[in-house]
C-alpha cells in the first residue's frame, strides 16, 4: 500500500495497492498508505460478511498515518482522521497509548498537530534505525520495534517497544 505517485513501470507483484496508479478507479486519490490498506480491509470485510465494527480499533492507526504522511486532510481523509482521532482520544491501541505517554501528551486531547510533531516523528525515526540483522536473538530495534509497538496488544510489552524506539 502506498500513497506516492508510482513509477511508470510497476514491479512484478500479486497486488499493488495505490490510489495514484494510472489505472485506479477509486474516486478518492489522496488516501495515506495506511488509508489505502484500511479501505482494502473494509472492502474485504464487506465481501466476506465481516461487520465494520471489527475495523474500528484500527482507526487510530489510520489517523496517525494521515497526519504523518502529510496527506491532504479533506474528503475521505478528513472523515478517517476525525474518527481516528476520536478513537485515539478515547481508546488508543496499546502501542499508541505508550507513545502518547512518552510524549507527555494529554491522552484525551490529542490533535493532528500532536501526531505531526510528536507521535509521527518518533515512529518515522525508529524506521530509520538499524538493527543487527545477523543476530536473530537480538531484541527488536528500529523499524522492527516500531512495527511491533504498533501491533502490540499488551500494554507492558508495548511500553518496552516504546522505550526501544524512544532511546
Where are these regions (language model features)?
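Short, ordered loop/turn segments at secondary-structure junctions
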Residues: 3-6, 20-22
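Histidine/acidic-residue-rich catalytic or RNA/ligand-binding cores of hydrolases
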Residues: 9-11, 141
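Short alpha-helices
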Residues: 11-50, 55-68
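Hydrophobic helix-and-loop "lid/oligomerization" segment in the mid-to-C-terminal part
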Residues: 46-167
Amino acid at each position: 500500500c502506498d500513497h506516492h505517485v508510482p513509477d511508470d513501470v510497476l514491479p512484478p507483484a500479486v497486488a499493488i495497492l495505490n490510489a495514484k496508479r494510472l489505472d485506479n478507479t477509486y474516486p478518492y486519490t489522496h488516501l495515506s498508505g495506511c488509508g489505502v490498506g484500511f479501505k482494502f480491509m473494509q472492502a474485504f470485510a464487506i465481501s466476506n460478511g465481516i461487520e465494520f465494527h471489527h475495523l474500528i480499533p484500527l482507526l487510530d492507526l489510520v489517523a496517525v498515518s494521515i497526519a504523518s504522511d502529510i496527506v491532504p486532510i479533506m474528503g475521505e481523509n478528513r472523515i478517517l482522521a476525525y474518527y481516528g482521532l476520536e478513537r485515539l482520544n478515547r481508546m488508543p491501541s496499546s502501542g499508541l497509548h505508550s507513545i502518547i505517554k512518552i510524549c507527555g501528551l494529554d491522552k484525551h486531547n490529542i490533535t493532528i498537530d500532536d501526531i505531526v510533531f510528536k507521535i509521527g516523528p518518533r515512529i518515522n525515526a525508529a524506521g530509520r534505525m538499524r538493527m543487527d540483522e545477523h543476530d536473530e536473538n537480538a531484541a527488536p530495534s528500529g523499524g522492527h520495534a516500531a512495527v511491533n509497538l504498533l501491533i502490540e496488544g499488551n500494554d507492558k510489552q508495548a511500553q518496552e517497544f516504546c522505550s526501544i524506539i524512544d532511546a
